[in-house]
Amino acid sequence: MQRLGRWLALAYFVGVSLLGWINWSAPTLAATASTEEELVNVVDEKLGTAYGEKIDLNNTNIAAFIQYRGLYPTLAKLIVKNAPYESVEDVLNIPGLTERQKQILRENLEHFTVTEVETALVEGGDRYNNGLYK
């Protein structure tokens, strides 16, 4: 008799738990389906533009300039410090550039682009040190 009582109690608790779970998850699923909207990350959106293919002078951090000879670290620091730019050629108007530095910049203008400043990419100190190390 005790064994039957235990089995009945176990069945009761399992049944109540299942009913509670079914009732609890149904409103959650309905709420999720009704409020579904496509969320777009502004940084991912920016990567779909020329930003993902070239160095964006207004949004890229210093580390991106490593791939081009002569730009990192001195010119990269000057470029980031004097941003934002209206056009790629504005980078040649940075005060204090030597003729050699201007020549290096001219040789690399094809690798640059300029887009609107995106706060998610430039706020804080991330343009100088994004915390990614090899």
From Swiss-Prot:
Q: What is written in the cofactor note of this entry? A: PSII binds multiple chlorophylls, carotenoids and specific lipids.
Give the principal location in a single coarse category: membrane
Q: Does the keyword Transport apply?
A: yes
Q: Name one GO biological process term.
A: photosystem II stabilization
Sorted alphabetically, the Gene Ontology cellular component annotations on this record are: extrinsic component of membrane; photosystem II oxygen evolving complex; plasma membrane-derived thylakoid membrane
Note the topology in the membrane: Peripheral membrane protein
Q: Where in the cell is it found?
A: Cellular thylakoid membrane
Q: Which HAMAP family match?
A: PSII_PsbU
Quote the subunit structure annotation.
PSII is composed of 1 copy each of membrane proteins PsbA, PsbB, PsbC, PsbD, PsbE, PsbF, PsbH, PsbI, PsbJ, PsbK, PsbL, PsbM, PsbT, PsbX, PsbY, PsbZ, Psb30/Ycf12, peripheral proteins PsbO, CyanoQ (PsbQ), PsbU, PsbV and a large number of cofactors. It forms dimeric complexes.
What does the UniProt function comment say about this protein?
One of the extrinsic, lumenal subunits of photosystem II (PSII). PSII is a light-driven water plastoquinone oxidoreductase, using light energy to abstract electrons from H(2)O, generating a proton gradient subsequently used for ATP formation. The extrinsic proteins stabilize the structure of photosystem II oxygen-evolving complex (OEC), the ion environment of oxygen evolution and protect the OEC against heat-induced inactivation.
Q: What is this protein called?
A: Photosystem II extrinsic protein U
Which source organism? Thermosynechococcus vestitus (strain NIES-2133 / IAM M-273 / BP-1)
UniProt lists the gene as psbU
